[in-house]
Curated annotation (Swiss-Prot):
The keyword Lyase applies. SUPFAM superfamilies: Diaminopimelate epimerase-like. Belongs to the proline racemase family. Keywords: Lyase. It comes from Roseibium aggregatum (strain ATCC 25650 / DSM 13394 / JCM 20685 / NBRC 16684 / NCIMB 2208 / IAM 12614 / B1). This is Trans-3-hydroxy-L-proline dehydratase.
């Protein structure tokens, strides 16, 4: 076999959402901080194109790059590459990275509980894993500070009319809409319609509402649209279905950890949740993340929360992505039949 590039990947999913992990073959990108390294990858596009575009990738895939941590408290660091963005943080990808580190033997597993600190571009992520018989069975991720941004504001969406929406940050930035008011029960056969409408709503929110993180002015857009179903009370806390539309037009198969964090921040702002309360988010395929408010914390001048989300991850395979020097598409390709709403 001829190859000018070989990248070693352990494939994983967290509650249905793919989050592959690059464990070898890629040198750390330039940058003094993890955020600068993230920004280089986002600008350069070479690695993103190679692993996310067809024929090696696809719109369904997220890929995480393991890099040496820059923060002295961190045991490992990772940079998240999503189909159209290189975000500060991701809950499902944090679970995938933790699963690969522990189940793959990269970080020593201690049963029954392994604790470690990961560094994401958006900040430190404290992880606790419940482990048994060599398997990390459930991953608990203490997320970055999350906060409500705008509450109950109007948004005009062409072809729909005026919606009442919220915006919030949970490690990534969201416009949040009432799924039931738009006729969605958040079931599998609605995925295409949710994806298409979600992209339109996200684009409208960026044009009309905008977003700027109070401590990181580089993060100045709304990434996703979260369709949130009605809440119900259970003996252990609140529960509700949700679906997140991801650019350029797909639905997250998991409940989206950053969306769970953002939704809990909105509920805290409205007095529906407080410290210690839990929320079970159910995805479009029926998988779930459990969220909990750990504490209150400011994000710049914004009152916020420190959320914890938990879920499960599974390794699905080991791959070596290669580049034959005669391949006319070294950066791959993407077509509108799958890449775009």
């Amino acid at each position: 076999m001829r190859s000018t590039k070989t990248i070693h990947v352990i494939s994983c999913h967290a509650e249905g959402e793919v989050g592959d992990v690059i464990v070898g073959g890629v040198a750390p990108p330039p940058g003094e901080t993890l955020w600068e390294q993230r920004s280089f990858i986002a600008r350069d596009q070479t690695l993103r194109n190679f692993v996310l575009n067809e024929p090696r990738g696809g719109v369904f895939r997220h890929v995480n790059l393991l890099v040496p941590p820059r923060h002295p408290e961190a045991d490992a660091a990772f940079i998240i590459m999503e189909p159209e963005d290189t975000p500060p943080m991701s809950g499902s990808n944090s679970i995938c990275v933790s699963t690969v580190l522990l189940d793959g033997g990269i970080v020593p597993m201690i049963e029954p509980i392994t604790e470690m600190v990961l560094e994401a571009p958006g900040g430190l992520v404290r992880v606790k894993a419940e482990c048994r018989n060599g398997k990390a069975e459930r991953i608990f991720v203490q997320n970055v500070t999350s906060f409500a941004d705008k509450l109950s504001v109007p948004l005009d969406v062409e072809g729909i009319g005026t919606l009442t929406v919220d915006t919030a940050y949970g490690g990534d930035s969201f416009v949040v809409v009432d799924a039931e008011a738009l006729g969605f029960a958040i079931v599998e056969d609605e995925a295409k319609d949710i994806a298409r409408l979600g992209v339109r709503i996200t684009n409208a929110a960026n044009e009309q509402l905008g977003f700027s993180h109070p401590e990181n002015p580089d993060w100045n857009h709304i990434s996703f649209c979260a369709f949130c179903g009605p809440l119900s009370q259970t003996p252990t806390g609140l529960t509700g279905r949700s679906a997140v539309a991801i650019q350029p037009g797909k639905v997250d198969r998991s409940p989206t950890g950053t969306a769970v964090s953002a939704r809990m921040a909105l509920m805290a702002a409205r007095g529906q949740m407080t410290i210690g309360d839990t929320f079970e988010a159910v995805s479009i395929i029926g998988s779930s993340f459990t969220g909990r408010i750990v504490s209150q914390q400011m994000a710049g001048d914004r009152p916020g929360i420190v959320p914890e989300i938990s879920g499960r991850g599974w390794i699905t395979g080991i791959h070596q992505h290669m580049l034959d020097p005669s391949d006319p598409w070294p950066g791959g390709y993407k077509l509108s039949d799958t890449w775009g709403a």
